[in-house]
Amino acid sequence: MTNPTRTSTQTDPGGGAVRGLSSYAQLTEVQLPAAGTFALITLTGGEGKPATFSSESLLGLQEILVEVAARVNSGQVAGVGITGQNRFFVAGADIKALKDLKDLGSARAVARLGHQVFGALEAMNVPTFAFINGAAIGGGLEVALAARYRTVSTDANAISLPEVYLGLLPGWGGVYRLPRLIGPANAVKVMIENPLANNKVLDGRSAYELGIADTAFDSPDFLSQSLAWADRIITDAARREELDQRRAAIADSSREEWDAAIAAGRVIVESKTSNAAPAPARLLDLLELGRSLDQAQSADLEVNALGELILSPQFKDSVYAFLELLQRRAKNPSGAPDPALARPVNKVGVVGAGLMAGQLALLFARQLHVPVVMTDIDQGPRG
């Protein structure tokens, strides 16, 4: 098969890539050998930083999706894909921006905006793809779930929905889409069990094995392999039907499967939090209520719940631990050594496996982009 070629880049009227305050979104036309024009959206935070979703960056992505939808509807585009850059797909929501929200109306508006933007990707009248090239955390994984098909890099090392760990829940569609993609039991594992197990994450192969991705490719040629696979899917109706039927069978999970998964989740929440943390219990309530609802009804529940949790003391405390305390002390440390003595940090070890240790590990991974190993006093390495 001839390799896909990029032919042009669409920009905003100002001549640059559409940009939000915390993320860039760039649209490139790729010519696929069989399918024709493919719209590839690349998200990046700029200057080597991972993309995150704030209101501004979501609106930037929405602007591009409106442009793409118009081209799709006029027959100019055969497929749509979204990917990231470097080692990151999307690093989730802009937590600092969420922390600054002061009222329920604003919090719910941000929750609703995520649904609107991701829904625009889902509603495209051509096959849609997420090429998960690296870390896909929280809202990053949720936007990937809004695509019809997904590829994942075998080198991706942080795929997760960690929201309950922070006092939130996956309120941009994850609560509805994930259990219908991988089954309720696996969804509880990803959304409840893993976050409460010191924020355990999936790697690319694990995500593929769970069914989050339809196929996995090695890193050096990940994008070109993903584009070639998309070309085959777009032009092979039988293959698309096979994937869709497999997905439909999982989405039609029995009442008993849902009951068992939710019950198992409640046991985990009780054992890990003694039911003192509202977010995981609220998530399980949404799963129980939403399993018989349509997507729009589930979205309303997610928006209300996420809005309330954004304003909760638990989330504010988590953000304080993540951002305020550590960053402020990093800027104004007491007894700091001479900066000339600083050396590059290539990896981090955290002794301890409790809540604070887990928060520190996640902070180091997000801010330093280096491997982090957690070791309990009486146990071996955990990550």
Question: Which positions does each model-derived feature cover?
Answer:
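A structural preference for short, pocket-lining loop segments at secondary-structure junctions
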Residues: 36-45, 58-105, 116-133, 153-158, ...
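Long amphipathic alpha-helix in the N-terminal Rossmann-like dinucleotide-binding domain
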Residues: 305-316
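Conserved catalytic cores of soluble enzyme domains
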Residues: 104-241, 351
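Hydrophobic/aromatic residues within transmembrane alpha-helices
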Residues: 82, 94, 143-144, 207, ...
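Hydrophobic alpha-helical membrane-association signature
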Residues: 57-61, 110-113, 302
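Amphipathic alpha-helical segments at domain termini/boundaries
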Residues: 2-40, 44, 49, 142, ...
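Phosphate-binding active sites in nucleotide-utilizing proteins
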Residues: 341-383
